[in-house]
């Protein structure tokens, strides 16, 4: 609450920011959300976005998807339909924000894998916003993931910004942005925040 009330929304207002990109894992549990958590999410995040006319692009992350093989049934879609300012992505998509072409890549799973990799190959967009599991990056401070996709398939892009891992790290053109605030003890004394993408 303190992060949203005292940091995030005041910054957006002060700098006239009218678009937010959420890189996934907005919700934590695949199968359910408590009423208390949903009420808090609406009060702290979704309602202020709506009240301030902020268009919000939300990628489906692995924690948002109910099943492991498809993103189609997901908490983002089910819990944000009442907000016309929120656009949910469970399939890869190309969009344009402020004159900048972006490839939006939600969690890559069996259902969207072929389409995702074809779009990575064919797109003319130079920037990817994703929820990617790439090997060789730190999930948490000091814990390197040895599984996942090879990051070299993204070499053609100028910049890749991705969610999924809590630890902020950069290697070449790939930027794991980390989570905005501490969520577990693994995040203790690990830099947190949000990022501004100036189009």
Name each region found by the language model.
Residues 85-86, 100-102, 125-126, 172-177:
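Active-site regions of enzymes building and remodeling cell-envelope glycoconjugates
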Residues 134, 140-199:
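Conserved beta-sheet core of the metallophosphoesterase superfamily
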Residues 5-12, 111, 118-119, 168, ...:
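A structural signal for the main folded, soluble domain(s) of proteins
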Residues 97-152:
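Binuclear metal-dependent hydrolase catalytic cores centered on His/Asp/Glu-rich metal-binding motifs
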Residues 11-16, 121-124, 196-198:
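Glycine-rich phosphate-binding loop signature in dinucleotide/nucleotide-binding domains
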Residues 24-25, 61-62, 131, 163-164, ...:
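Active-site glycine-centered loops adjacent to acidic/histidine catalytic or metal-binding residues
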């Amino acid at each position: 609450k303190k992060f949203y009330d005292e940091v995030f929304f005041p910054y957006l207002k002060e700098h006239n920011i009218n678009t937010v990109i959420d890189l996934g894992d907005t919700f934590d549990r695949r199968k359910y959300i408590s009423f208390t958590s949903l009420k808090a999410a609406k009060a702290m995040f979704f309602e202020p976005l709506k009240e301030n006319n902020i268009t919000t692009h939300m990628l489906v992350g692995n924690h948002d998807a109910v099943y492991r093989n498809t993103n189609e049934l997901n908490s983002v879609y089910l819990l944000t339909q009442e907000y016309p300012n929120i656009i949910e992505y469970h399939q890869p998509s190309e969009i344009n924000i402020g004159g900048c072409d972006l490839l939006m890549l939600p969690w890559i799973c069996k259902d969207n894998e072929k389409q995702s990799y074809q779009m990575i190959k064919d797109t003319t967009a130079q920037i990817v916003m994703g929820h990617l599991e790439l090997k060789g990056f730190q999930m948490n401070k000091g814990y390197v993931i040895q599984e996942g996709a090879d990051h070299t398939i993204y070499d053609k892009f100028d910049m890749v910004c991705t969610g999924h891992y809590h630890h902020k790290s950069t290697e070449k053109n790939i930027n794991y942005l980390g989570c905005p605030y501490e969520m577990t003890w693994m995040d203790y004394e690990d830099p947190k925040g949000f990022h501004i993408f100036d189009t």
